[in-house]
Amino acid sequence: MYPTSAPIEHALLIAVDWRSPARGADRAESGAKRPLWSIEDALEELARLAETAGIEVVGAVTQKMSRPEPGSYVGRGKLTEIRELKDDLGYDLVIADEELTPNQQRGLEEALGVKVLDRTALILDIFAQRAQTREGRLQVEVALLEYRLPRMTRMWTHLSRQTGGSGSGGGGGAAGTGGGVGLRGPGETQIEIDRRRARDRIATLKTDLRKVHDQRELYRERRRGHEVPIVAIVGYTNAGKSTLLNALTDADKLAEDKLFATLDPTTRRVRLPSGRDILVTDTVGFINNLPTTLVAAFRSTLEEINEADIVLHVLDITHANAAEQSQATLQVLDELGVSDRPTITALNKIDLFDDGVVPAELAKDLELPDDFLPISAETQVGFDALLARIELILDRELVPVSVSVPYAQNALVDLFRREGRVEGVDYNEYGTAISGQLPPRLLARFRPYITAKSKHPQALLEPA
């Protein structure tokens, strides 16, 4: 009988603890970024990532150092300790909590005789498993190849063996290619051929991605033509974003309790209490130290956030590292240039508190904005307040305006009623005269029909 699935890998997690404040100066000199997380929290998240990738974690080893060893990540004594644990724990895979240099990865594999992955490779592997759309798969392959390119060494087997799928071999090291440690791959000439093939493949993929991006931009243009406000749900992975979108739209799609359950953006229509429609988009979850290759590769997908009128930041208030998760999310939003967008901070899973109220001390510790909203995507507690807040923000942006719309342009009258606030209507021989308020994004559509009664300067401005 043939096996129907790949054998489960057993991983030992390793991490260098340079989180001590006393070592901050050393880290600053080396240009490294001090993490916000404790070593225990970082390893707990790494274990969750491994579990999501289908890997069983059998143990963890840490070492306090001012900086990782350049050739082996951990020190010589710790390396011996890790090697001696192999028989006791039965691990066949080692996962490092940070992104390893090619020298560190190679040094660990040669010393331990097992495949070695780092945090970046693990996340890339999860993305490779979960990408559903053509765009998502293209983005993941670009990120994988760009990660692997500098790691092609004398022990690198032929690229054609790598492109059929990643499995858990995202690290790209010798032991992860199927050749095994000690089995030399091609010579230097073949390595150069492989590198050129990888660069050519990346160029081809990026060309394909540009075409997909152009198609997405056409979709966005059509969506803009309908002038429906957009709310982008953002937040740390597994914060409950997909559950929230499903609850808002009465969808019965299963929201998995796994990291990175959503990679491809999902957009659905939601009706506000006033009858106004909005589009709500669920985006890929963020994570601490999200690999730069993934941020770059998924930039076109993350552009959905740039299109949003409102950013809805969902935070798992019950998580022990809620503050760190919030900061990681805000950092990515800042990198995307949307940190100044109107933002609602929704504290999810409030139903897990006995009285359904966020403790004042916790809110203070998290340095939350004063106008945060407690909600439960599971029980829909706080949804009325959430929808009202969205409506309030949309109304706050409205511009007073008076227009006279020809009868032949009645679709604009419907648009005004649907997306604006009508305060007065009069019908005359020229058309429909409306006074009220409109969102700024609609002013260009109505500018030919704006009358002198419009006192607000933004309404009277000529287009640039």
Please provide the spans of the model-predicted regions:
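Conserved beta-strand segments of the P-loop GTPase G domain that flank and frequently precede/overlap
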Residues: L13-D17, A60-Q63, I95-D97, H313-D316, ...
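Conserved C-terminal guanine-recognition region of P-loop GTPase G domains, centered on the G4
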Residues: P35-G54, R83-D88, D97-V114, S274-D277, ...
